[in-house]
């Protein structure tokens, strides 16, 4: 798959919205049940920009969004600065082509460049592809929480994975 990874722009929001709403309606990757509108994604985009956090997109030669990735604060308390939670979503017809790896690798590089310390992934425990992707890039399972969510008429379990971006770094 020939795709370029780049910073997202406002023009990418309709493509991001379509991928997001597909995940809402058809997967357990997002635990929301109600699709969102473009204003919601614009507010999310603006919030990431204010916080200095990236939104990356994988796009084809025509600029069409094939996937996206981002991170934001893990928790809103000062003691968690340096730790972010990330998301990676790939368009349904593009899954299994390596875009998730490309997006997550680029996101890890960006987090390291920003001097962050830990990246956290919160993954529905049945999502073997996402767990495998994260393991491949060095993430380790750090916890599991059974039946903490629900969607599609069933309980969902949550697996936490994390990557220490600089294990030799001293505490501040």
UniProtKB/Swiss-Prot annotation:
EC annotation from Swiss-Prot or TrEMBL: 2.3.1.-
Residues that coordinate or bind substrate: 75-77, 85-87
Keyword entries, A-Z: Acyltransferase, Transferase
Cross-referenced CDD domains: NAT_SF
Keyword Acyltransferase in record: yes
Residue ranges occupied by any N-acetyltransferase domain in the UniProt entry: 3-166
Domain of life: Bacteria
InterPro entries hit by this protein: Acyl_CoA_acyltransferase, GNAT_dom
Catalysis: reaction(s): L-methionine sulfoximine + acetyl-CoA = N-acetyl-L-methionine sulfoximine + CoA + H(+); L-methionine sulfone + acetyl-CoA = N-acetyl-L-methionine sulfone + CoA + H(+)
Pfam family, one: Acetyltransf_1
Annotated residues for binding of acetyl-CoA: 88-90, 96-101, 127
GO molecular function: acyltransferase activity, transferring groups other than amino-acyl groups
Gene inactivation effect: Cells lacking this gene do not have acetyltransferase activity and induce a degradation of proteins. Growth in succinate medium with glutamate, ammonium, urea, and proline as nitrogen sources is stopped by the addition of 200 uM MSX at the beginning of the log phase, and no further growth is observed for the next 12 h. Growth with glutamine as a nitrogen source is unaffected.
Function text: Plays a role in the resistance against the toxic effects of L-methionine sulfoximine (MSX), a rare amino acid, which inhibits glutamine synthetase (GlnA). Catalyzes the acetylation of L-methionine sulfoximine (MSX). It can also use L-methionine sulfone (MSO).
Oligomeric form and interacting partners: Homodimer.
PANTHER family tied to this protein: N-ACETYLTRANSFERASE, UPF0039 PROTEIN C11D3.02C
Protein's UniProt name: L-methionine sulfoximine/L-methionine sulfone acetyltransferase
Organism: Pseudomonas paraeruginosa (strain DSM 24068 / PA7)
């Amino acid at each position: 798959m020939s795709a370029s990874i780049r910073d997202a722009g406002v023009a990418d929001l309709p493509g991001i919205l379509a991928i997001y709403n597909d995940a809402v309606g058809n997967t357990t990757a997002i635990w929301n049940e109600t699709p969102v509108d473009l204003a919601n994604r614009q507010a999310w985009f603006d919030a990431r920009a204010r916080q200095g956090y990236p939104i990356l997109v994988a796009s084809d030669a025509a600029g069409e969004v094939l996937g996206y990735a981002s991170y934001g604060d893990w928790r809103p308390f000062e003691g968690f600065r340096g730790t972010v939670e990330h998301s990676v979503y790939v368009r349904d017809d593009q899954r299994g082509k390596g875009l998730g790896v490309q997006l997550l690798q680029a996101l890890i590089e960006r987090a390291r460049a920003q001097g962050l310390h830990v990246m956290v992934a919160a993954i529905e425990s049945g999502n073997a592809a996402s767990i495998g992707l994260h393991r491949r890039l060095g993430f380790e399972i750090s916890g599991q929480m059974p039946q903490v969510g629900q969607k599609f008429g069933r309980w969902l379990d949550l697996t936490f994975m994390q990557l220490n971006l600089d294990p030799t770094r001293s505490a501040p």
